[in-house]
Structure formats: structure tokens, C-alpha cells
């Protein structure tokens, strides 16, 4: 992938920056498959001794086996691994149990529930890993959490490394809410794990230096093209509250909202209404830029970079996909990318990318860039599909 480091010229341009909103929290709007035999049953049938381990509320023991050799595992880039993961997830069907990129070995690790699936993975060039919980079972566990534990300040996502649903509670979850959440997670047994995070889950909304609207500030995510016309993507909780934008406080309009989706999703589309230059680049805050040529899906284990006007450029890793986060006030967002990239108020709506590939728009999270934290991103491909747009 190519990195463009073009020095800034004297011509005013509007690059990809991380949106932030300085105002109150936004208003709410709105092939046959082998039949597998459970490993648990096989263990009970083949042994007279069953070890029962009580782990309290946090289930630390993974139900996965790493003893399957990586026959023929291909050396892959993160991008190639992501494409292989998509193909295998489709081909494995009910035998699929998630996957992640091993950045050290440069291989795609694919979870499966039986040897037939493992052989299919090896033939495709992945490293097979037989685990206890299928992806369908983990999705069912997520459904239980949605039904019984929809509590502000919580999030959950399937973690393919531990083969569990990782449930996280922020500092606001205590008392009866904590007891309720703990009981639900405990009831899910080896399918879930409960953890705490410092701080509070919130959309990362605050002042920035990119675009202004109605006394509030945000900054764009990625420049895109729709029907041959220029637009940009930003966070939905920005476009939910502001209808038009300028590139200076009190300045002339440069764009007007064309669409907004928040909560449930967190993306918005703004159409340029001026002749402001709009290159498909991300500001690297060192006088250079990163060219963006395509959009893609993130992969667990992938190294990623975030650009934001508050904390500028920071790196991290994708830890989960299809995450759900409850920001409170009924603002629940689904299908997010969960990462270890730090972020702070003012970075909201900013660009998450890997090389020249656009991955996400900063939604929210907890912690900061001094102590670290968890940050969630709206996938870019979903937003592009919703609006019929493309990177450009």
C-alpha cells in the first residue's frame, strides 16, 4: 500500500480530520455442513472425571485449543488476511467461529468447531484453531445480553481470541446495575467474560478546529464522491445536531447535511457547497498526509491508525468487531469496530485507517491518551453503502 506524504501547499484544502462536537449530547433519533458433536458431550462421554471451575463474575479460562498445527498457513498482510477471513466466514457457514490476524506470525487464525472445518481452513491458507463456542452461539449470547442487560455504560463484542463475548462496564455501572449485569454474564457460562474500564463511555464530542456549525465544532472523516459530486463522511452524532458547516468559526458555508444516522449507527453525509479543495487524504499532523484510495473492513488483530484534531495521530489494534455500546440516554450504537487506539473529546468522527484504506469514523469510548482506553469506530463501508458513495 502506498503512502503519500505530500507537503501542504498554500491552497486551502479540507482534509480528513477527526470530528468533535462542542455542545450537549446529541438528540436521539432517530455446500452441506458436517453436523458437529459438542466437545462438552464428547468429554462427558469419554471421561468419568469432570472438572468444574468456578471463576466468579470474570471468566478467565478460554475454551479454545491452540494445538492444531498451522499446515500450509500462508504469510499474509493484514489486508489479505481480512479478505481471506471474509471468504472463509462465508464458506464455513455454521462451522465458523470467528478469526483474527496474528501480526507477529503474519497469519490469519481461524476459529472452527470441528476437524472438518479445520481442514478447510488449512487448505485455504489459514491457521485453524478448534474452539468450543461457534459464532452462532456467541451471537446468541449477545442476544441474551441485549434482552436482559441493556444498561447504560456497557458494551459487548465477540472476541475471537478468547472465543467469548467480551462484556465491558464503565465506571458508571454500579449497585443494582452491576449486580444485574454480573448475573446475566455469569449465566452465560463460558460464553462471556465481564471486565471493567476506567472512565465513562461517551461519544467523543468536544471542540475541534476543522468545521463549524450552529456554534458547534466537528471535523470530517473521509472525503467521498456520490453521483460525481463531492461529499464527506463524519459522525452521525455530529450531523444529528448541525445542518450546515463552515471551515472557520462564523465563516461561509462549505457544506450542508445530506443524511444522518444516529443512534443505532453513527455516520453522517455532508455535501460540499463551495469550491473548497477536497483531496482524499488524511492529515498526519506533521506537515504531510496519507492518501486514501479505498475503503475496507477491519480485521481483529490489525494494526490501525487514528487521526484526530484533539490528540492528532495515534496507533493501536483492532480487538473486536460488531461491537455494541450503550452511551446512555437511549443512545445505543451497534456494529462498531472496537480498538485499543486512544482518543479524547474532540476526536469524534475522525479517520481510522490502515495505509491507504479507510476503515472507520470515531464514534466514542472511554479513557484518554495519557492512560489509554477503549475506542469504538463506525465502519466506513457501511456508511458508503447506505449513501451510495465511494472514497474519492
From Swiss-Prot:
CDD domains attached to this UniProt entry: alphaLP-like
Keyword annotations: Disulfide bond, Hydrolase, Protease, Serine protease, Signal, Zymogen
Annotated GO CC locations: extracellular region
GO molecular-function terms, A-Z: serine-type endopeptidase activity
Protein name as it appears in the record: Streptogrisin-D
Listed GO biological process terms: proteolysis
Propeptide residue intervals: 65-204
Gene (name only): sprD
